[in-house]
Amino acid sequence: MKILAISDPHGDYSKMKKIIEKAGDFDLAVVVGDITNFGPDEKVDELAEMFDKPVLAIPGNCDQRTILKALENSKAVNLHGKAEQIGKIRFIGLGGSNPTPFNTPFELSEEEIENALEGMVCSAENSGECGTIVLLTHAPPHGARDELPFGHVGSKAIQKFLDRVDLIVCGHIHEAKGTEKIGKTVVVNPGEACKGSCALINIEETANKPIEVEFMEV
């Protein structure tokens, strides 16, 4: 499965058409938050309508909580707090972020994040249908793609799922675009879509094939 991963468009979709064109023939798009820049929620429809492929989406900390209703009513699949099975790949989503110093609209406590994810990840681990488990979060795990000049700011709750899932696609920290592998888990931050950054991720359903990641700029 070829996945187009985008994050942090912040309501500026001026680069999206070029991103989609350059990505070429992909199977699925995932949008991992900050779809808007504190609203309006109606921007969701504008973004979703740009794709002619399925879209899984979660909100970011700069989205209003009311965006969940807009996502439900859009062409995109609202994956916040939910799981979706596509072939042998289980996608698990949780939007918002761990607490920030800025009191942004969609923040969750570390306890809320852990409680929301544990049941879904455990279910996927115990399912014979899941060849690959993909976690879509806006916030990165603590210690991976989360570094700012003053230290690591990722979620310690999400960190607990490293080595339990195969792939984490996250955003939030604009400066941390890139990928790294911790245990068996590949962590990908596709960069700011509003600046023309994205990532193409290829997941083979056959066992033991490595996850391939290619970053693009337009």
Language-model region placement:
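Short coil/turn segments at beta-strand junctions that form active-site/ligand-binding loops
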Residues: 1, 27, 53, 130-132
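Active-site-proximal beta-strand elements of phosphoester/diester hydrolases
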Residues: 2-10, 88-97, 134-138, 186-191, ...
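Core catalytic region of metal-dependent phosphoesterases/phosphodiesterases
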Residues: 6-86
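Divalent metal-coordination and catalytic microenvironments
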Residues: 8, 29, 34, 60, ...
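Binuclear metal-dependent phosphoesterase catalytic core
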Residues: 15, 84-87, 108, 156-164, ...
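A short helix->loop->beta-strand "cap" motif at the edges of active sites that frequently abuts
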Residues: 51-55, 131, 164-166, 184-185
